Structure formats: structure tokens, C-alpha cells
Amino acid sequence: MADVLDEVYAVIADRKVNPKEGSYTTSLYNHRKGIDKVLEKIGEESTELIIAAKNGGEKEIVSECADLFFHAMVLLAAKDIPFEKIKEEFERRRK
């Protein structure tokens, strides 16, 4: 599973330095609100996950959780924080 997350993060980070027309990720980086747009999306996806957890089924929860993970990864890349740092933090907490 970590491999697919690494791959997704690599694409997200690449879109920052190599924008691609029509890319949703590129549109987040280039939004007129800047990082605030990414933060808005994180807030929105967090709320949607909470609602899915309260009222939805497994499929909705998984979908909203993936959306939240994705936008958190965009934030990391926007702030030049490697995804590896998150994995290291989980490793540290596991000990």
C-alpha cells in the first residue's frame, strides 16, 4: 500500500514543478487563493469524511478518506515536505 501512496505523492510533487494543463492538482497549485485553496479543500474533505462516518457506509468513508489523504499530500508537496517524513513519523510513533 505504501507503494501506491508513494506513487501518488510523486505525481502530486511533479505537478508542482511540471504543471500539466487540465490537471486537478495543477489547478490547486495555480489557484488565485494559493495555499488557502488547498487548506479549504482539506477542511471540506474533513467535513465530508465526518459526515460519511456518521451517515454513510464503508464505500463513502473510504472515498472521503482517500480525498482527505490526497489533499493532505498536496499540502505536503506545496510546503516541500517529502512524504517520507510522514512515514518516518509513523515509524517513530510505532516504537
UniProtKB/Swiss-Prot annotation:
It is found in: Cytoplasm. Pathway: Amino-acid biosynthesis; L-histidine biosynthesis; L-histidine from 5-phospho-alpha-D-ribose 1-diphosphate: step 2/9. Its main location: cytoplasm. Its EC number is 3.6.1.31. It holds the Pfam family PRA-PH. The keyword Nucleotidyltransferase does not apply. One of its GO terms (molecular function) is ATP binding. Keywords: Amino-acid biosynthesis, ATP-binding, Cytoplasm, Histidine biosynthesis, Hydrolase, Nucleotide-binding. SUPFAM superfamilies: all-alpha NTP pyrophosphatases (SSF101386). GO terms for biological process: L-histidine biosynthetic process. GO terms for cellular component: cytoplasm. It catalyses: 1-(5-phospho-beta-D-ribosyl)-ATP + H2O = 1-(5-phospho-beta-D-ribosyl)-5'-AMP + diphosphate + H(+). It is an enzyme of class 3 (hydrolase). InterPro entries: HisE, PRib-ATP_PPHydrolase-like. Belongs to the PRA-PH family. PANTHER family: HISTIDINE BIOSYNTHESIS BIFUNCTIONAL PROTEIN, HISTIDINE BIOSYNTHESIS BIFUNCTIONAL PROTEIN HISIE. This is Phosphoribosyl-ATP pyrophosphatase. The lineage of its organism: Archaea, Methanobacteriati, Methanobacteriota, Stenosarchaea group, Methanomicrobia.
